[in-house]
Amino acid sequence: MNLEALCKEAELSFYDDELVSENGKKIYRIYVQKEGGVNLDDCARLSEILSPIFDVEPPVNGEYFLEVSSPGLERKLSKIEHFAKSIGELVKITTNEKEKIEAKIIAVDDENITLENLENKEKTTINFNDIKKARTFMEW
């Protein structure tokens, strides 16, 4: 099953998916984006496309709930493409060496992310493979 193509059919772009357990229930979440933002009708349209397909070809074993939503303003960055689409945004990164970084994404290439330190404006480049986890954040 090609989630990216199915999202495109609903005029959305696939961002990510995850399987989580909350209160003993399995939830299969699909995150989507589109220019101008995702609304409830967009999520419902994709859910209507996916439900009959998932009835025949379930994405996970056993009983589960399907959720379709936008990844949100503060979202996980797990692919190099996520960083590329987040240029200009603030990010919290934990490296494989457990170093914590808060910076602004200023450039992305095939395997490196260039960041600007929020305090001293110093620029640094980090290899994507050196990142354990990353998430955008907003300063309120």
UniProtKB/Swiss-Prot annotation:
The keyword Transcription regulation does not apply. Keywords: Cytoplasm, Ribosome biogenesis. One of its GO terms (biological process) is ribosomal small subunit assembly. Transmembrane segments: none annotated. Gene3D superfamilies: Ribosome maturation factor RimP, C-terminal domain, RimP-like superfamily, N-terminal. CDD domains: YlxS_C. It comes from the Bacteria. GO terms for cellular component: cytosol. It is found in: Cytoplasm. Belongs to the RimP family. PANTHER family: RIBOSOME MATURATION FACTOR RIMP (PTHR33867:SF1). Required for maturation of 30S ribosomal subunits. This is Ribosome maturation factor RimP. It comes from Campylobacter jejuni subsp. doylei (strain ATCC BAA-1458 / RM4099 / 269.97). The lineage of its organism: Bacteria, Pseudomonadati, Campylobacterota, Epsilonproteobacteria, Campylobacterales.
